[in-house]
Amino acid sequence: AQGIVLVEGKSDVTFLRHAASSLKQSGALPASLEDVKIVPVLIGGCGSVKHWVTLNLAKDLGLPWCVFLDSDIGGDPAQVLSIQKRKKEVEEAGKVFFATRKREIENYLCPDLIEEITGVAVTFTDTCDAKKIIGRAVGMKPDNVLDKFWPQMTSERIISRSTYHDGTQERSELVEILSDIVSMTR
């Protein structure tokens, strides 16, 4: 490994790897995570980030590192506060902390894709519990939703579902985050 991204769980690994590979294939990203040997490392809940910082674990590996977490916006306010605290700790350590603009990674899934695959129309917002809503609608465990559908998201859909407006400018959150991550080792 040439660098690491600290993430909460296995779905985050699927999310980042697939998005980077798809965006690279379409030319929206210069490289995939594998190309630049950046490895997502599962650390469990957001509370573990604090220990990685205070115990210098990532630093002791001698590799560039950053953190990628769900923002949980629209969820438990205490959790949102906890994530903001972790962000401050990571940034004070001189590292980059990425929190999703949407509540969780499942909120980036394309409802049309889910309907194409399952025949079930599902509606969700950027800040609702999409994982639960989709899971209930299609009859699967919420924790399996991302791993089932995300690998079938095209680059076009990934860009479309992560587009936001910054003033008059249209930007793609996932292209920006992944560009920063893949350039971390350069």
Residue ranges and their predicted role:
Residues 1-186:
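Acidic, divalent-metal-binding catalytic cores of TOPRIM
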